[in-house]
Amino acid sequence: MSLHTRICDIFGIEIPIVLAGMGGASNPELAAAVSNAGGLGVLGAATCRPDELREWIQRTRELTDRPFGVDTLLPASVRKAPAGGGAASATSPSPADQLPEFKRFTTEFMEREGLGEFPSEDDLRKKGFMEDLGALFSKEVFEGQMEVVIEQKVPVYAAGLGNPGPWVDRLHANGTVVVSVVGAVRHARKAVESGVDVIVAQGHDAGGHNSPVGTMALVPQVVDAAGDVPVLAAGGIGDGRGVAAALMLGAEGAWIGSAFLAAEEAGIEDYQKKALVEANEEGTVISRSVTGKPARLIRNSWARAWEESDFEPLPMPFQSILAGPVQAAAMRQKRGDVAPGFAGQGIGMIEAIRPAAEILREIVEGAERTLEGAPGFQRGAG
């Protein structure tokens, strides 16, 4: 048998499996590898500046002639950056300086972990944290990314967070398929009303920003709410059995991220990939310590320190600015126990660092075996 659903026809692909647009990890090399293997590769462009996104799109087109997508964030609650660029300009104080207790907390954490001192405001700007992290999570940059997606006539666009409704008409005019990632039935209904082509039902099991509702419970409810709009299941799907289960729940394919994090082509460091291979099903935690919004990430001392403190994380983008120096210092020292990385509960199924095509092929073969065996659970008429 072969896996084929409406998703294949809508995206122009052979297999109804989509690489989730994971920031940093889902780079042109990984996206192209998944597309070349018959699935749909999606660039994780949340932290790309518009000009960098343009380069990523062009690089992906050099690596594949098959359909691919771009995933960005469209959060409604992000504050607008002040005139002059960046969430904190040269004349505006940093969030850490506005809230000295947060700076003190972070400074003590860095010293305790042997990560050096918390950078001064001038150092932060010199190293790009104030500009890069502050401006990246701004309304202006999100809108700039969308203009590049439209300019480049990307085959598929996915809103990893937020409602793409205001952009649907312009995207459709380009022939772009529009995908909306949702974590609640009400969001699915709103996405349908907005005219999206595909919905991703992303449950609590997923890495990154996700839903408070588990994947098994969320998917069928979103399928019912979506009507004729096809649904991809996401969250904790790490092998072919998960894909088969998603299809049985009414989804027409799977949106898979963490299973590809240890792919040879993935844009994360080797020490991070090795940590994923060694992880188990209990290796993740929900935390607001990185972006200010709830997200599932690999257990680490930064998230634990926030959980044990009396502080409420700052709103986006200020929490990212505060966490930036910690992440950068931890990555320089290759401290996977400190540097937070997004990942889902399916990481316990990651067994080795392998090519993306091999991972995809194994998932497909596993799904086919599972579906072929499903009739055996039915009782005979006699």
Language-model features: locations:
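Acidic, glycine-rich active-site loops and adjacent beta-strand->loop/helix elements
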Residues: 74, 204-205, 236-237, 259-260
